Amino acid sequence: MAKGQSLQDPYLNALRRERIPVSIYLVNGIKLQGQIESFDQFVILLKNTVNQMVYKHAISTVVPARSVSHHNNNHHTTPTEAVENVETQAE
């Protein structure tokens, strides 16, 4: 398992398991909304009124509608923190 997967998979799995609505921003600026139905190494299946298969390489940011209780030192990530983390990584 790649180093990046060790954070990505548990985070996406928590979003899927808890059925947390997400906004997914693509690199071209398009915003998609829905719930994560499933995911693998390359794609996320997003469910709303229809199912959409979104390629991860096209995703800029994933923003949950509420806190995510993934098991990363018992830290709950809020939507604001998620955006701040992305902005910090971009600098």
UniProtKB/Swiss-Prot annotation:
Keyword Transport: no
The keyword RNA-binding appears for this protein: yes
Domain Sm: 9-68
Region (Disordered) residue spans: 68-91
Gene Ontology molecular function: RNA binding
Keywords: RNA-binding, Stress response
Alphabetical list of InterPro entries matching this protein: Hfq, LSM_dom_sf, Sm
GO cellular component: cytosol
Domain of life: Bacteria
GO aspect biological process, one term: regulation of translation, ncRNA-mediated
Biological function: RNA chaperone that binds small regulatory RNA (sRNAs) and mRNAs to facilitate mRNA translational regulation in response to envelope stress, environmental stress and changes in metabolite concentrations. Also binds with high specificity to tRNAs.
Subunit structure: Homohexamer.
Family statement drawn from the similarity comment of this UniProt entry: Belongs to the Hfq family.
Protein name: RNA-binding protein Hfq
Species, as recorded: Haemophilus influenzae (strain PittEE)
Lineage of the species this protein comes from: Bacteria, Pseudomonadati, Pseudomonadota, Gammaproteobacteria, Pasteurellales
